[in-house]
Amino acid sequence: MPRWQAGTVALGDATNRILRQAVVAERDQPPFDRVTMDGIAISHSDYVDGRRSFPIEATQMAGEPARCLTAGSCIEIMTGASLPAGADCIVPVERIRVADGVATLEDGYVAEQRQFIHARASDYAQGDELLSPGRRISPLDVAVIASAGLAEVDAAKSPVIRIVSTGDELVPPG
């Protein structure tokens, strides 16, 4: 039997090969508390205390460093942005009314702590083993490997096996 062809391969060439290394997360995923809805970021304690209108102190876009929320106010926030320090609740844009720089929650809206927040390391934490050696690499595995920060992996070609049956004992099917 020929030896398996093994070595480092680019992710684009890794599908259907046999993984020869553990794939370990280089960082937390997500790497920060990530907002999952456009809207406003508030402190849930302000909501519990009865506040339903919040002056908008800033806007935070995805990719910008996290801002710091002032008590009693809100930060307009976009999907994918880092959760501002001091905020622990996101109210979707569909549930607020904005006038004169103040966001007001719609009547009857119930805000929950940590709602619409994808928590840091909730998918996996730095150091977690994501894939074990010995598995056939699927297209989904390629996505996992890429999300772990790797552009190439140690992998082997799958062996090709053929069965050749011979002998007088063999009879045609049927």
Task: Place the predicted regions along the sequence by residue.
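Short, glycine/charged-enriched hinge/interface segments at domain edges or termini
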Residues: I40-G174
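Short, low-complexity N-terminal leaders and the immediately following helix N-cap/first helix
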Residues: M1-R51, G101, A119
